[in-house]
């Protein structure tokens, strides 16, 4: 009798998954699929119960915190902190130490720059992101709201010369600032003197000009573009007076942009079925083998995309060299709370998906460890989300060691990025870094998930401030400062990335340029952006500001953050004085955000997309956005700031808004007027069951209704 699986050791392995590992992943590697699954079985046997026990500990701690708040309506900060220490929520400080991570690529340890995050499920998006290592500054200025799209500057017709001239003016201003000329401006350049040994420009007044800092000149590209270097970032100046529509001879400026890219299996991806998960692994395999490609139709034309080749240059001494044409990629695995039935135990129970991710993405990375194209240092970079405290970090480090042994990989090849996005990790960040000290290459902050956990952890304590006002609370600024100061205290300077969160408005590039410099000023060596265009524009910040110099100042001041502020819960001020109008605005905003994201997740399997908010501004949303919005509504409902009836009305009203926002999509399935589709049910359940959802995570409900949708469709 045929089955859909085969038994290997103590596992039931889905047949299509076995075939994928056997015929695709192991092809070209010195390991067989049977050996791989036998090793996976042994690792699951060793770590599965540990995974379960760590999740039990989360529940136990949350239960104790809930009880404490129910019995302590007025919070004494000292007593509260002592309580958290007594129950093991806060762990002992590990003392002074420095991380000992080795074999880290320069993109992580030596270069500050933008970082993209891209769902692994979409080949086209993955290729766009990884190929965004270099980007045209002219295109990004001309095509975005950095230059207002109105009056004589409109983009309503091709090659608006006034807009082109303004684009070139902005680019020349940028060059004058970051690579200045002696007694001249880039506006005056007509051409470059064809000489390799030094950089000399012809000016429109007949004179010559050179760089104030001649060491910034690195060489020439194969087609004669000028390669400069500033703050460890490269840029190309394209001189071509014949093609230039501007009075100067500068045709374009090509910036090194997305230095690193996180290829995401987690919050921005939706992989409910086995086929979807295998598709995600296959895309990552294409990246590591360097043969990923995508073919699609745009405006009636067939377009094919593949990974960029390296860029070739000749240096000032006439020697040939190359620079990477692609981002260095990291891979984000799922958290330890996720499970899969693609590989089951013999009793048909699900296994931890995080363990499977660690094994499979590491197996796939063996292709790059042979080629040394992505990582020149022979490392593999795994970003691990949703870790709660040092015990879970240690568990992950032990797991990585076992994966290395199983796959015959050199010790400490698997590096880790730790997301500082859960409250227990924030309060124990130094201890978390200590547990990962020989592997850690990345820490970062993220407002959405971190606030979602802040709300859920203190759910019983009281009603929280309006979602957009929580950033004004003391805990949040301390959280952001603490991440940088603890990271530098532990020796991450020029060894590992310290990151900041996403700019969520992909169409608002002028606003991004005005606001995102604060991440660099805070000491962050990388910061998340939503698109290749945003990466190129954000790269201008890193040219203008030396992050490593700022980090040195922070280290020299040795100023500790006031960690007591981390315990200040962001309560709603004077809830009795909150007007009904403000309540309705808040719950409408949250309901619209939830519906706009969930309807695409359930009906289309899209884990990350640009969703219009209630004011029709496009926002990049993933499950982190959903977590904070659903937990905030659940909190207000629990504390009777609003009623169930008000929330039901908000969801129905906002479903009509979301339907109208998507009416031009021929594949969109409206939620109104019946309000009984799976997307609508999932959205409301996320709120009405929000208090019960472990840590406020949304996956269980999303997956349940996505499965129902797929079953109904089939």
Model-assigned labels for residue ranges:
Residues 81-85, 89-139, 143, 147-148, ...:
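Acidic, glycine-enriched catalytic cores built around paired aspartates
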Residues 7, 11, 26, 30, ...:
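Hydrophobic alpha-helical scaffolding
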Residues 2-3, 82, 88-395, 402-409, ...:
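Catalytic alpha/beta active-site cores
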Residues 26-31, 46-53, 67-74, 89-93, ...:
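Intrinsically disordered or highly flexible coil/loop and linker segments, enriched in small
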Residues 12, 16, 20, 31, ...:
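Generic recognition of stable, solvent-exposed alpha-helical segments in well-folded globular domains
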Residues 2-9, 17, 351-354, 374, ...:
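Catalytic or ion-translocation cores adjacent to nucleophile or general acid/base/metal-coordination motifs
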Residues 16, 20, 24, 39, ...:
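Generic, well-ordered alpha-helical scaffold segments in large soluble proteins
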